[in-house]
Each structure stands twice: as structure tokens, then as C-alpha cells.
Curated annotation (Swiss-Prot):
Family: Belongs to the UPF0134 family.
Top-level division of the source organism's lineage: Bacteria
SUPFAM superfamilies: MPN010-like
Protein name: UPF0134 protein MPN_410
Organism, as annotated: Mycoplasma pneumoniae (strain ATCC 29342 / M129 / Subtype 1)
Taxonomy of the source species: Bacteria, Bacillati, Mycoplasmatota, Mycoplasmoidales, Mycoplasmoidaceae
Pfam families linked to this entry: DUF16
């Protein structure tokens, strides 16, 4: 199977200029691995355009250095995200602990309120008994000493 590789390296361009004695050109190297041959297909031009080859418009190439820089920056961004996530996880753990403590405090307060409610009920019952005894005493006093 033939492989097409775009041709736009400046060094290769200068070498091709020396060989062909022509100006600028654009095209493709066609590499045939079956017979280890390299062909050039494209258009040759006698006009010089600042001694630079014409780069195909539709293609974009990234150097290894640019790719590694992108990879490193992406890794650094991921590391930052991981550190923020771990920090947020720790904050969430602290918040859950405080919520659990507050829940225990609320339960203790509920128990205290129940105990106070029972005490108030008991005091109310004793007050009712005292009122009943006072009423009975006033009734007895009225029987002994009728009002005139």
C-alpha cells in the first residue's frame, strides 16, 4: 500500500531545488514500501515564492515538541483538577462530621426536652391536686361557716 506524506520541510525543499533546478513546488511524497521507492507527485512552478514551499491548506501538522508541550500542559491541568477534587473531598468529609455532631446534639436536646416535658406534666398534676384539695377545703369551710 502506498503512503502519502506531505512535502514542506525547508531542508528537503532546498535539496529538491538543487536536484531539479526549479522554483517552488507543492505536492506529496508517495512512499511505496513494497519496492522501497519514493516518488514525488505534485505541481512544479518556476516562480520563486520567498524560497518556501506551498503548504497544503487542508493539512495541519504538529511537531513532537508541540505535542509533548500540549500533553504536559494537559497533565498539569489534570493534576490541578485532582488536587482541587481531593481538597473538596476533605471539605465534604469535615462538613459531614460537623453535621453528624449537630445531629447528636439535636438528639440530646430532644431527650432533655422530653424530660422537661415530663417534669412539667408532673408539676401540672401536682398543681391540679393542690387545687382540688384547696377547693375541697373551701367547700368544707363554707359548710362550717355559711355565708351570711
Amino acid at each position: 500500500m502506498k503512503e502519502k506524506i506531505p512535502f514542506y520541510n525547508e531542508k528537503e525543499f532546498n535539496e529538491m531545488m538543487k536536484k531539479t533546478k526549479k522554483g517552488t513546488f507543492s505536492g506529496w511524497y508517495i512512499i511505496n514500501p513494497e519496492n522501497n521507492s519514493v516518488e514525488f507527485s505534485g505541481s512544479f512552478n518556476r516562480q520563486f515564492k520567498l524560497n518556501k514551499p506551498i503548504i497544503p491548506v487542508n493539512t495541519e501538522y504538529v511537531t513532537r515538541k508541540e505535542f509533548n508541550e500540549y500533553k504536559d500542559s494537559n497533565d498539569q491541568r489534570l493534576i490541578k483538577i485532582e488536587t482541587t477534587l481531593t481538597a473538596q473531598g476533605e471539605q465534604i468529609n469535615k462538613l459531614t462530621q460537623t453535621v453528624e455532631k449537630q445531629g447528636e446534639q439535636i438528639r440530646e436536646l430532644q431527650v432533655e426536652q422530653k424530660a422537661q416535658g415530663e417534669q412539667i406534666k408532673a408539676q401540672g398534676e401536682t398543681l391540679k391536686l393542690i387545687l382540688q384539695t384547696l377547693q375541697k377545703m373551701s367547700d368544707r369551710l363554707d359548710k362550717i361557716d355559711p355565708p351570711k
